[in-house]
């Protein structure tokens, strides 16, 4: 980010910058740090020594391109070479070689990595920063108990607590605690040093009994006492080296390694001057912490707010990759030790190259990217989704919180989040508040803190010289920070104005001359998702949250369209997403087609730019680039060459501007349902393309290898019509549900005994040979119909059972909008399409145009997302005047009712220019009288009409609709399975049963709870009677779920039986359940 001398100018940082900086820091610093920690390895006789040299390492440029890595399901990585030396101590000779120690997955231009052909991204984690924190809690008597918690770099905790008698204890486990004197002595201090280094020696002496003196008489005694309490060991343990090692490993290593950040925090909190390279907890730290705790007890010092961002640190991509590199080197160390021992045992002469294998590093990174909770598959639904995913911040993950243990205070917005973490953008559900999003201008500092930029105002002029500062959360408490920018203050004389400001986590109104810093940008506090919502200041925050989440679910449409009303950030989002093709140098277009653009560069060299053609994203949306330049045109560096999915002219374009009326229509927009015109279907307004991938593998079985073939016995020729001579579906074929995509036969042993006797007799009469293979073809599942656009046959070298051949078939589907699809605006106004009306039946305007969509007006007042009304009316004015608007939020800071004035003035101008008085009617501005398409009569009340930007979301009915006639049943309850993927059934739950009971439909209810559910015999009889014909017999015994309940009660020693009462003589007939 740059700040020049001009008033309030700045450039928005690259949205992928956080990821790039993290990866660069890992390559530049993290690798060297970890290699320098690699120990010298010696053999048992200490004759040979192996070591790695940190000065020189080399990353080789990848051999394969990104696209090839994705297509072939390989990892886009670079080979790492390090210098290693082998020293023979007897002859003092050294052999040095450059050795290959493994592959490191590289980051591409999108800030993501490609592992096994899948785009993956590492998200940043928020952890409690290592250091010391003071808190107080009320005990059962209502007395404040003060504690000091030391958190290590590994997340281990050591608690110091002070009791009523001012004695200080260190809690070593949940139940055990030891005196602070014993802990200090065990760490190497004697009593004299302890008393010299504390501020309150008399308090320490007050609880020094004879027993205590004996415990701290020597270091050995203190360690034994500490070990007894820590390990809960009875008797008298004997001091030994192994006992010290156990304590070191289980206690000191986990709870006393502070790290670089922890040392800095403890020095700052306790006013110590211990060198930064001393990353372990020292007796001086413990004693200073105890002094501070005594001060707290007597009312001195302040308690810590654990949720303040100054007490948090960001574990970035660099830290996670460095941790994994250290883990891989530890594994490599064990391998080298084993190899040296083996070489000496077999009397072989080792070389550095022979001792090292690339497996530990390569497998460590592959398992990290594949299994670690913070490494996620990149969501590529649309360009916005790709960018936002890399800017997530998570409290979850290893060393962090879980969705069930995190309390409300952690999830809540904190004043220190201002300008660093977006107060709006978070996930809904159990993880609300635990997964956040970085604010636009926030960056990660050197110490793992989140920094936000501000303009510094100098005392003399308050505006002449402006300098940009990045402040960490611990720094900005000391400044008065004005929330507005100078434009908002220019309405009057600045010196006389009171401005809203922030000081010490409070929001105040202060005089302009008292301000030290001011904000640099109206969007500074929001994430990218929230910054794309126009008029966000008029919306309730809950709806803004939904909107920022739903924009990430928008499907790229076949013909994208820019929004009329936007915020100005659309261009930056599109450019940083990497979806449009951008010229890397200036030149002249020599050739262009759908697959590539050829550009002449400096001199005679030409540059070929390949375009993405119908590429599948991991959400099955279609990624496609369309050339925007003509042959012979001269272009400049940075110019848009081709638009991608959901971008137009280099701007983000997720939806469509369509004509909308807010009115009820025959109950079809009840409860957020949406009524649409058939024009949206036939005009392909909301048509999108989806690409599905189907894959099959061939294995080598015990009976022999599987075969790909077109000759499949027992199958109709109709199903095999699209296969070529190899048995694979042909490119361009139209395929329907059930068609064979790849023909495959699996060998099986033919056993005569497995057939029924009459089957064997028939085979003998007709001379039919017993089949030696069974058909295991790849068939197109339900809902998969479409056009085959690509077929890939991936053959690994040396095709074994471990390296099977893979055949992939890609099928493109064209999906128009239909009943059951989900649409949404940019203000959290979402709905399901309930009916598609003929255009002649839709309500129409005074100029005869039918509206495209009808929303329910009751969805606005209760949800308080009034921004949609402003956008709707301004969109109508923009479409009539052929204008586009880019509006920054919080425009009311410049003038009262600024948004309303802008909208009404634009509507008035549109009314004048188009000579349509109905566009702006002074009695009800923004509303208009419209007519019923069925009768031609005007509606009773004027209705608000406009052109908002409406998105089609990825929750589509084609992916959700599902039916079942019969299928699999659960083994225990004998009820149908749940879910579409398992061909499951519908559950008739408690409330559904009540609804049916309310209508008295006893027979339907009985069917649903027996034949259609878990009555095994009745199920079979129903099948028989429906085939043969006849009446369905009534089930007499209980269904399986009732029998399961009886068995579960019996396991609790409760026996349950039921009785049948005779209708004639009311005799009880006992019958066993």
UniProtKB/Swiss-Prot annotation:
EC assignment: the record states 2.7.7.6
> What span is annotated as the signal peptide, if there is one?
none
What InterPro entries would the database entry show?
DNA-dir_RNA_pol_bsu_ext_1_sf, DNA-dir_RNA_pol_su2, DNA-dir_RNAP_su2_dom, DNA-dir_RNAP_su2_hyb_sf, RNA_pol_bsu_bac, RNA_pol_bsu_CS, RNA_pol_Rpb2_2, RNA_pol_Rpb2_2_sf
Catalyses: RNA(n) + a ribonucleoside 5'-triphosphate = RNA(n+1) + diphosphate
| Alphabetical list of Pfam families matching this protein | RNA_pol_Rpb2_2 (PF04561), RNA_pol_Rpb2_3 (PF04565), RNA_pol_Rpb2_6 (PF00562), RNA_pol_Rpb2_7 (PF04560)
Q: Which SUPFAM superfamilies match?
A: beta and beta-prime subunits of DNA dependent RNA-polymerase
Q: Does Plastid show up as a keyword for this record?
A: yes
What molecular function terms (GO) are annotated for this protein? DNA binding; DNA-directed RNA polymerase activity; ribonucleoside binding
Which is a GO BP term held by this UniProt record?
Answer: DNA-templated transcription
Localization terms from the record: Plastid, Chloroplast
| Keywords, alphabetical | Chloroplast, DNA-directed RNA polymerase, Nucleotidyltransferase, Plastid, Transcription, Transferase
| GO cellular component terms attached to this protein's record | chloroplast; DNA-directed RNA polymerase complex; mitochondrion
Enzyme class (EC, first level): transferase
Q: How does it assemble?
A: In plastids the minimal PEP RNA polymerase catalytic core is composed of four subunits: alpha, beta, beta', and beta''. When a (nuclear-encoded) sigma factor is associated with the core the holoenzyme is formed, which can initiate transcription.
* Record-stated family: Belongs to the RNA polymerase beta chain family.
* Classification via NCBIfam families: PRK00405.1
Instruction: Briefly state the protein's biological role.
Output: DNA-dependent RNA polymerase catalyzes the transcription of DNA into RNA using the four ribonucleoside triphosphates as substrates.
Tell me what this protein is called: DNA-directed RNA polymerase subunit beta
Which species expresses this protein natively? Aethionema grandiflorum
